[in-house]
Amino acid sequence: MNAFTPREIVSELDRHIVGQKDAKRAVAIALRNRWRRQQLSEALRDEVLPKNILMIGPTGVGKTEIARRLAKLAQAPFLKVEATKFTEVGYVGRDVESIIRDLVETALTQERDRLRKQVNAKAEANAEERVLDALVGDRASPETRQKFRKMLREGQINDKEIEVQVQDSGGALPTMDIPGMPGAQMGMLNLNDIFGKAFGNRTKARKMTVEDSHAVLVREEADKLLDEEQVVKAAIAAVENNGIVFLDEIDKIATASERRGGDVSREGVQRDLLPLIEGTTVSTKYGPVKTDHVLFIASGAFHTAKPADLLPELQGRLPIRVELSALNAGDFKRILLEPEASLITQYKALLATEGVTLEFPDDTVEAIAEIATEINGSVENIGARRLHTVLERLLEEISFTATDRSGETIVVTRDMVKERVGALAAKADLSRFIL
């Protein structure tokens, strides 16, 4: 995993997310502590457990976005899941142990990609030989092969069609559900795993251009050079030591104290999460995986429920609490302008593909931010997601007619904002009284 300092992690998150300094600092420290733990002696390393985080804040303020950006930054097995997906063991639905199984699958993909890069040079050479075999046959003289090799490397025969033998995946075979086996890979029996050898080594002839065959053959040759046992071992080690799970919508499985009733399944999910977060061993088809050092970051809006409505034991296992603040008009203005891929940058780029140049003066950006804040205040506060609604309504006409206006420069004015989005704000007050 990357050895970024907390300051570097925060500055990287700042490129994409406005504000929320406390949340950024908390995840930066947690991520750095993963690296610090790796530097300790083995005896002490086992004792240092991750300090799990609970992020609390209204919807649309950046909780999920922090998770998405952290995933790209961490270069460690990372999984983002919604707590609402899961049900208590014994109920229909996924049980929480599938989180770790999915995390292992993610780690395997990462590990294979990393190891493929290491053997890439040899795989490229082997793939080149296979292309030459398809072009001139394996009995051609060395001079002929050398001549074609030169043409191949110079790209002169990229468009030539060849027939190569590639592995036949044959499409995924259907899976069967075995009731009453929650520990056995989600109760799923995969026929590919049983008959893998019989089906996996079949090849089929495929016709493709020399250029297209390159990526297919390099990947195949790289996979032949990988030691699958080593890949699995490294992936499980990565999950156990560096795995990060982001549990979104945790508030949806908390039952408000005055509404406790038939929601057994929701509280059951919390109970099932306890051992997972505290540290347990989960059975996967690749072997047992310990979760003692997996970092859990939970987040929720807590509109109807409060953090105190979570089971006390679960609260205790999420010791670091971070509150994310609601966004105001000033924040909205910064969101529209500052991030690298801000909404305004995205819309400008999209319409530039049609030859239309969009311009947003400062007062227009202010008007968009103000009207988004106004609607959030009068209907339902959905945070920065309201900007999507406002901009879509504002640019709807321009987007529709863009193909006929190629070469034009369109200045989006404050008056256009009032004219096209003002009605949305005017209706907002009444909408809450309409059934």
From Swiss-Prot:
Task: Please give the biological process terms from Gene Ontology that the record holds.
Answer: protein unfolding; proteolysis involved in protein catabolic process
Q: Name one GO molecular function term.
A: peptidase activity
Q: Where in the cell is it found?
A: Cytoplasm
Return the Gene3D superfamilies for the record: 1.10.8.60, DNA helicase RuvA subunit, C-terminal domain (1.10.8.10), P-loop containing nucleotide triphosphate hydrolases (3.40.50.300)
Q: Which UniProt keywords apply?
A: ATP-binding, Chaperone, Cytoplasm, Nucleotide-binding, Stress response
CDD domains registered for this protein in UniProt: RecA-like_HslU (cd19498)
InterPro entries tied to this protein: AAA+_ATPase, ATP-dep_Clp_protease_ClpX, ATPase_AAA_core, Clp_ATPase_C, HslU, P-loop_NTPase
Q: Where does ATP bind?
A: V18, G60, V61, G62, K63, T64, E65, D248, E313, R385
- Which residues are the signal sequence here? none
This protein's GO cellular component annotations are: HslUV protease complex
Physiological role: ATPase subunit of a proteasome-like degradation complex; this subunit has chaperone activity. The binding of ATP and its subsequent hydrolysis by HslU are essential for unfolding of protein substrates subsequently hydrolyzed by HslV. HslU recognizes the N-terminal part of its protein substrates and unfolds these before they are guided to HslV for hydrolysis.
Similarity-based family? Belongs to the ClpX chaperone family. HslU subfamily.
Matches recorded under PANTHER family: ATP-DEPENDENT CLP PROTEASE ATP-BINDING SUBUNIT CLPX-LIKE, MITOCHONDRIAL-RELATED (PTHR48102), ATP-DEPENDENT PROTEASE ATPASE SUBUNIT HSLU (PTHR48102:SF3)
Q: How does it assemble?
A: A double ring-shaped homohexamer of HslV is capped on each side by a ring-shaped HslU homohexamer. The assembly of the HslU/HslV complex is dependent on binding of ATP.
NCBIfam families, per the entry: hslU, PRK05201.1
Name of the molecule in the record: ATP-dependent protease ATPase subunit HslU
Natural source organism: Rhodospirillum rubrum (strain ATCC 11170 / ATH 1.1.1 / DSM 467 / LMG 4362 / NCIMB 8255 / S1)
